[in-house]
Each structure stands twice: as structure tokens, then as C-alpha cells.
Amino acid sequence: MIIKRIGPSFINLAKNHKSLAFLIPYACIMVFLGLSDAALQTDEGGDTYISSTILKYGFPYHQDEVISAMEHARVREDGLFIYRTWIPYYLQASSLFILGKTTFAARLPFAVLGVTSAIALYFFTLKLIRKKNVAFLATLFLISSVPALIYFRTARYVGLPILLTVLLIYSYITIFDKKKWSPWPITIISIIYFHTMYVSFAGIILGVLIHFYINRKSTAPDNYKRATQAGIITSIFTLPWLWFIFPIFEKIPEFYIAQGDQIDISSGWRFLKHFAGFIFQLNNYIFPFILLPLLFIRSLRTYKNEIQLCLICTSSLMGVSLLNTIPFQQYMAGSFPLLSILLALIIIEGLSVHSIVRSTLTATLIFTNLIHVGPLLSIKETFGNNPKWFSKNFYMKSTYNTFMREVKLKYVFYQHLLEISNPYKGPLDKIVAFFKTNGKPGDSCYIDNEHESLAYYTGMKVIHRDDIKALDNPDWIVLRGDYRHAIEKNLPSEIAQNLREILRKHPYSKIELDAPAIRVNNTYDIQLHLFRSPTSADKIVIYKRTDY
């Protein structure tokens, strides 16, 4: 009976939405191809190791009997992990439980939900705009967006706000339908969203509330009561968590203050700096803001309310995200589907041009960043001729270097195709391969970067970068990151002195690994992401203890 019902429904779906026959396979290729080629990089390794503790203890912890992870965010004596909300960790732990502790298992749930995001965006756009061609193009933009694809392929929570934003706003806009509104979908999704990434949820739900207040007369009065009920139930299942994790709000700023003048967390200008950082990144990779005025042209007045919703939610998300210590683009991931809709709306409904022109513009937006950074090239030339303007402090120098590096013509979509079709191998991949042959679980090993990832793959007792003592005598010492020159250059830091003392007191053989001495395997930050396997004349050095 169930099969008889599903069969015709699936056939009707395929007939009515033929573009999905292209979009779904395309999304699968872009997300899944080469998914497990590279080892888990530093942030992936840390989160995945936290997830693996769930398999041992039932709850996420900072430590197990092998190593500890993210000690900078530890606030409870029992080591219970409360730095972030738990749903992504239980999601990943389920995959590890079923498939084992592999790279593929660590990334699989996030990749699956990435493809689901594309499908959800198609139907959400169709519901919102009521145009199949706009729904198709918005979805195409999202699954051709390299930052989004990298997030979907990352073993972390960073891509989940994309899906949850779509589901949350979809459940919200049904309140304006001419039928009885059920508050349960938005309630359940809100609770899940909060316990996935509460800062992103706060931004989107704030936008929803603002939009609802502005358009409250467009829905039935009975829905006010139902919306209030949804808010109360959501609060019951979310607000206690903020009380539970309150100590973390003091702990994390302390960690960043220790970083010196690299990060501004106290000056009155920090919010403006963060705002400029978010706008710069979104403009360069997601939505070229030179097109923003087109949203207010006459041909798009029919979609005034829909545009308003997307802009309000994007703005509120950015406003809340300004509270973060660093303006990472990942905090704006929830805006990606909304900006994709606006971009598709401009091209399909806003421009009265021939279809060939639309296709050319679409291809330009996907394959190049010409429209994104073109208006900034003249500014870059001016800055390049006046570098002294940015020499006052480290922050200004860093901002200048980022601007000069990022404002140039790029073809990141093409580079992504190269990455997924050619196995990426970074320094950590070579290190893991070396120890799977030469090391064994239980060996003690000091490594100056990505210790969680190494422990995840090898089962070795890995010593954290800053925890090495002069009295330690690890079986292995790997220098490839922050302290790779600690021995030869006679660095004065305590860690460098401890390493030199260990090598002086104990016999070690020196091995030079044919891998570049780079501190991280890769990163999901599009501005720093490597698409091809790196090379360097500076090689990783491994010391093996020889007195046994």
C-alpha cells in the first residue's frame, strides 16, 4: 500500500519539477566527489574528536584517556563540553557509530544535509517567489557557491545553518497562507536550529520577528496566539542552555585577549570593523553588492514583501553576528540561500534582457568573481600606491594584506572542480600515512599542530602543542607548524627550550618527511582554502626515540 502511494507521488514530483533531475545529481557530484580525499584539518579534527567522546561516555567531553581537545574553552571541572550546542556532535557521533572512525563517516552527515539544503531551497524559493525558473537559478547559485560547498564538505556545523535557515523561514511564511496555521513546524525547527548554532538562530529568528511585526495585518488574528505559543515552547527548550553555558562567555574572550593586538574585542570600532569584514567577504564570494540597487527597480515591485523578508533576515543575522569575536564568513552562512534567491530574482525578473544575456550573466557570476570585485580594483590600485596608510598597527597591516590578496580576479569554481577531481593531499595526510606504517596505537607523540586529527586516525597519545615539558620523553616528535624551527633557530620560547632539552637528554633519530612544513592541512575559510596539494622546500621533521 505504501509503495503504491509513494510511486505515483514520486512520478508526479519528477514531472512537475524536471529541473531537480539536474540539480540533485549536480549537487551530489559537487558535494560528495572526493569527500574523503584529505584528512580532517584542525577544526574538523577537534570537533570530530569531541564527537567521538560521545561514543564512549554518552555526552561530549573535552578529554578521554588519550588526549584533550579545545582546552581553551573548558569551563567545567568534569570536562563536559559546553563550548557549542550539541546537535552537530550527536549527528556526527551517529555516523561514526554506524560507519566507524573514518574521514568519510566524519563528513557524511554534513554532506548529506548539504544536498538536502539544495532541495529545500528549491521548494522554499518556489513557495516564496512562485516561479520555477527563479527556484532553479537560486538553487544553482547555492550549489555552485564554493564557500557553501566547502562548508557542506566540512566535518563541522558550519554548513547546517544554510538548511535550517531555509526550513525555519519556510515554516514561518506559511503563517500568511489562507488556512489554519500550525505552529509546530517552526517550533521544532527553531529548537533544532538553536541547539545547532544559537548565534545564527538568534539572527534569523530576530529577522522573522521583525518581518512578522511589519506584516502582522496580513495574517489572521488567531495566528498571533499560535505564534506566541510557539515562542513560549521554544524558549522553554532553549533559554536554559544559555544559563548552563554562561561561564563560556567569559572564558572565550580571555583566550582571544591573550592573542594580543591581532584581534579587536574591546574598542568602540570593533562592530564597524566586523561589519566591514562581513560585507567584504559576502561581496567577494556570495552576492556582489553593486547589484543591490536593482532589488528596488520597478520590475521587482511585485516581490516587495519577499525581498523585504530576505533583506531583513540577512541584516538581522549580520547584526547579531557582529557580537562574535572575529567576523568569519561562516557566521553568515545562514544568509547564503537568501542572497541566492535575491540574485536569481534580479536576473530572472529584474532584468528585461534577452535570455542569452541572462545566461551570460549567470555564467559570469558562477565561474568568475569579475562582477564581485571589479568595482574594487581601482581602490586596490590606490591602496597599493599608498601602503603607508595601513602601517599604524598589526590590525591595519593585516587588513591591508587581506584586501590586496582578495581583490583580484579568481576562478574558484574552476579550482573547486580541480580539487574534487584530483585527490588533495596536505601535510597531515603524509604524517598520518607515515604513522600508520611506522607507529602504533598508544605511542606517545608530540606534534605542534592538529593533534586531535592525528589522535583520531592513529590512536596515539598525542601531546598538545603547548603542553610539552622538559621532563617528557615522547616516542615521536613532529615539527611542522608553530615550532618547526624551534631546534635549529634556537628560539627563546619555553616550548622551544623544552623541545631542545628533550632532544639533548634522549637519543632521537631525525627523519625528514617528503611533505611541506605547513601548520594546517587545509581550511574551510574560502580566503585561505587550498585547492591543490601544497608543496614547499621546507619539509616536515620527525624525531623518533631510539633508546628502546
Please report, for each region that a protein language model flagged, where it lies by residue:
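Membrane-interface helix-loop-helix junctions at transmembrane boundaries of multi-pass membrane enzymes
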Residues: 9-18, 122, 127-128, 132-133, ...
